[in-house]
From Swiss-Prot:
GO molecular function per UniProt: 2-succinyl-5-enolpyruvyl-6-hydroxy-3-cyclohexene-1-carboxylic-acid synthase activity; magnesium ion binding; manganese ion binding; thiamine pyrophosphate binding
UniProt-recorded name of the protein: 2-succinyl-5-enolpyruvyl-6-hydroxy-3-cyclohexene-1-carboxylate synthase
Pathways per UniProt: Quinol/quinone metabolism; 1,4-dihydroxy-2-naphthoate biosynthesis; 1,4-dihydroxy-2-naphthoate from chorismate: step 2/7; Quinol/quinone metabolism; menaquinone biosynthesis
Needed co-factor(s): Mg(2+); Mn(2+); thiamine diphosphate
Catalysed conversion reaction: isochorismate + 2-oxoglutarate + H(+) = 5-enolpyruvoyl-6-hydroxy-2-succinyl-cyclohex-3-ene-1-carboxylate + CO2
SUPFAM superfamilies according to UniProt: Thiamin diphosphate-binding fold (THDP-binding)
Family matches, as Gene3D superfamilies: 3.40.50.970, TPP-binding domain
Group of enzyme by EC: transferase
Organism: Shewanella sediminis (strain HAW-EB3)
Length: 569
C-alpha cells in the first residue's frame, strides 16, 4: 500500500469496525474529540445506524455511555483519542465491569514505533484497564491483513458479552484522507455476501447458562418458613414476577432499593427499618429458608440478617457465575434469569402465609413515616419521599450514592405506581452520577429525575454540558447539605475531625453553574417551593436544576429520631 493511501485504509478499517459493531447490536456511539481517533470518528460520523453523542470530557463520556447501556440493554461504543484520554474512562469501566454492563472502548493509538520513545500523547494503552475489560489489540491497518480477520475478532469479542471490551486501534499518519480515490474492491472481495446483508460476519448463538432445580428440589426447598429477597435487578429482568412467586409460595418478599420493587404494595419494602423493630426482627428470625435474587444489597441491616441467620436452605439466583455475597454464606447458587427461575412449577409452601404480620408492620412504618417525615420539618427525606410519590411506570428515577440512595431505601413510600430505578452501586463511587443519569435519560427520552448530593454534583459539574443536550424532561435535584454529611452517621471519633477531614463544608451554591450551561434553575428551602418547582420541571421538555438547601445535621438527626420511634413501635 502506497503511503498516500494510508489515510484511506485507516478510514476503511474504521468503517468496517463501526459497521460490524452496529450489526452486533450497538445502537449508540459516544465520542470525544481527538486526532488519533480520526479514522474511527469519521467512520462513526457517516454511520447512519448509530446515534452519536459527543462530550469534551472522557470521564463524563464513559459514564454517559454506561447510562445508555443500562437502559438500552445493549453494548455502547466509546471513541477516544490516545493518551490520558483513554485513562479517564477507567472509573466508568470499573463500574460497568462490576455491574455487568457492556461497553466497547475504541481507543485511537500511536503505532508501535512511537510508543515508549517520548512521542507526543503516547502511553502504553493495551491492558490499561487490567482485569476490568476484555482486551483486543489491533495492529495498524495493513492491506496484508484480510478484512474478515478484523470482523471475526470483533464478533468473538462482543457477541453475548455483558462486560466491557477495550479495542485498541493503532493508526499511522496521515489520518485525514483528502480524497477517497483508493480502490479497495479486491481487498473487500473476500467478505462475500457480508457487504449485502445486515448480519455480523460470524454469528454466535445465545449461550444458555440456565441451571434449574428439579421438582423434588423445589418441594424440599419450600418446606417450612422462608423469605424471598430481591436485590439489584434491572427493569429488563421483569422483577414483577417475584411478587407472583411470593404470593404463590406464601412467603414474604423483602425488597432492596435497586430491585425495581421498593415502592410496590405487594412487598415488604421497609425491611431496613423493620430490622430495627424488635417484633418484626423476631418474626423474621423464624425463617428457615431464603431465596435471594441478585445481590449488591444496600441495607447493612439486611446484609447482617442474611449473614447471622442460621439458614437450613439458602438459594441465590444470578444471571451467570459470579460471587455476590460478602458474607460468604454456604448456599446453592443457580444460574438463571429471574423469569425462568420464578416461573417454574413451584408448590405452595407448607408454611404459607407464616409472616403475614410483616404486612402490618410494613404498613405501620409507612404511617410513621407520614407523621415523622411528611408532616415534619422540611428536609432531605421529605424531598426523597415526595419525588418517589410523583413517579409513574413511564418515568425513570436515578438515585445518587451516599445519602440519597440510603434515604430512598429507608423511607420510600408504598405507592400504586413506581418508576424504573437506576443506580451506580458496583463500586458505589460519587463520580459520574450526573453523566450516567444523562445517558439513562437520552436512550428513550422518558421523563427522568436525578437525586444527587452536593459533593457528587460538584464532582461531576461539567456533565451539565451533557444535560443541556437532553430534550425530554430531565430534573436534577441537588440535596445541598453543605458537605459530605453522610459522615454524620458514621462513628468518627471527634466532631472536629469529622468537620475538617470528612464533611468538608464548601459553602457553595449551584445557581451560577446552572447559568453557565444555560439550564433552568430553582433554589428552594421549603416544601411548597420545592413541590411547585418540581411539578414545573417535570413538565418541561428539557433539563432543569432544583437545588434543595437543607441544614447540615437535619437528615442525620431525623434518621436517629425515626430509628428511636421504630424501635419503640
Amino acid at each position: 500500500m502506497q503511503i498516500d493511501k494510508t489515510a484511506e485504509l485507516n478510514l476503511l478499517w474504521g468503517t468496517l469496525i463501526l459497521e460490524e459493531l452496529s450489526r452486533l447490536g450497538v445502537q449508540h456511539v459516544c465520542m470525544a474529540p481527538g486526532s488519533r481517533s480520526t479514522p474511527l470518528t469519521l467512520a462513526a460520523a457517516k454511520q447512519s445506524k448509530l446515534k452519536q453523542h459527543l462530550h469534551f470530557d472522557e470521564r463524563g463520556l464513559g459514564f454517559m455511555a454506561l447510562g445508555l447501556a443500562k437502559t438500552s440493554h445493549a453494548p455502547v461504543a466509546i471513541i477516544t483519542t490516545s493518551g490520558t484520554a483513554v485513562a479517564n474512562l477507567y472509573p466508568a469501566i470499573i463500574e460497568a465491569w462490576l455491574t455487568q454492563v457492556p461497553l466497547v472502548v475504541l481507543s485511537g493509538d500511536r503505532p508501535p514505533e512511537l510508543i515508549d520513545c517520548g512521542a507526543n500523547q503516547a502511553i502504553i494503552q493495551p491492558a490499561l484497564f487490567a482485569q476490568y475489560a476484555k482486551q483486543i489489540n489491533l495492529p495498524t491497518p495493513d492491506i496484508a491483513i484480510r478484512p474478515e480477520a478484523l470482523l471475526t475478532m470483533l464478533d468473538e469479542a462482543i457477541s453475548n458479552q455483558s462486560l466491557p471490551v477495550h479495542i485498541n486501534c493503532m493508526f499511522r499518519e496521515p489520518l485525514y484522507p483528502s480524497t477517497m480515490s483508493a480502490d479497495f474492491t479486491q481487498y473487500l472481495s473476500t467478505l462475500g455476501n457480508w457487504q449485502h446483508t445486515t448480519s455480523p460476519f460470524n454469528q454466535y448463538g445465545k449461550t444458555s447458562q440456565h441451571s434449574l432445580p428439579t421438582q423434588d428440589s423445589l418441594a424440599r426447598f419450600v418446606h417450612g418458613k422462608g423469605v424471598i429477597i430481591a436485590g439489584t435487578l434491572s427493569p429488563q429482568e421483569s422483577p414483577e414476577i417475584l411478587v407472583e412467586l411470593s404470593q404463590k409460595l406464601g412467603w414474604p418478599l423483602l425488597t432492596d432499593a435497586q430491585s425495581q420493587l421498593r415502592q410496590h404494595s405487594g412487598v415488604i419494602g421497609n425491611v431496613d427499618q423493620l430490622l430495627h423493630q424488635p417484633k418484626a426482627r423476631a418474626l423474621l428470625a423464624q425463617a428457615e429458608s431464603v431465596l435471594v435474587f441478585g445481590g449488591r444489597l444496600l441495607s447493612k441491616r439486611l446484609i447482617n440478617f442474611l449473614s447471622e441467620q442460621k439458614w437450613k436452605r439458602y438459594w441465590q439466583v444470578l444471571p451467570q457465575q459470579m460471587r455476590l455475597d460478602p458474607s460468604h454464606s454456604a448456599k446453592q447458587v443457580w444460574h438463571s434469569s429471574v423469569a425462568a427461575f420464578a416461573s417454574q412449577a413451584w408448590p405452595r409452601s407448607s408454611d404459607a402465609n407464616w409472616a403475614l404480620q410483616l404486612i402490618q408492620f410494613n404498613d405501620g412504618l409507612e404511617t410513621l413515616f407520614q407523621q415523622q417525615i411528611d408532616n415534619a420539618e422540611f428536609g432531605e427525606a421529605m424531598v426523597v419521599r415526595a419525588i418517589a410519590k410523583a413517579q409513574n411506570r413511564q418515568s425513570q428515577l436515578f438515585i445518587g450514592n451516599s445519602l440519597p440512595v440510603r434515604l430512598y431505601d429507608m423511607y420510600a413510600p408504598i405507592t400504586p405506581d413506581y418508576p424504573r430505578t437506576y443506580t451506580n452501586r458496583g463500586a458505589s463511587g460519587i463520580d459520574g452520577l450526573l453523566a450516567t443519569a444523562c445517558g439513562v435519560a437520552k436512550h428513550e427520552g422518558k421523563a427522568t429525575t436525578l437525586l444527587i448530593g452536593d459533593i457528587s454534583q460538584l464532582h461531576d459539574l461539567n456533565s451539565l454540558a451533557i444535560a443541556r443536550t437532553i430534550e425530554s424532561p430531565f430534573v436534577i435535584v441537588i440535596l445541598n447539605n453543605d458537605g459530605g454529611n453522610i459522615f454524620n452517621l458514621l462513628p468518627v471519633p471527634d466532631e472536629k475531625l469529622r468537620s475538617d477531614y470528612y464533611r468538608l463544608a464548601h459553602g457553595l451554591e449551584f445557581g451560577y453553574g446552572a447559568a453557565m450551561f444555560g439550564l433552568a434553575y430553582n433554589r428552594v428551602d421549603d416544601f411548597e417551593s420545592f413541590n411547585e418547582a418540581y411539578q414545573e420541571a417535570i413538565a418541561f421538555q428539557g433539563p432543569s436544576v432544583i437545588e434543595v438547601s437543607v441544614a447540615q445535621h437535619q437528615a442525620s438527626e431525623q434518621i436517629a429520631s425515626i430509628a428511636t420511634w421504630v424501635k419503640q413501635s
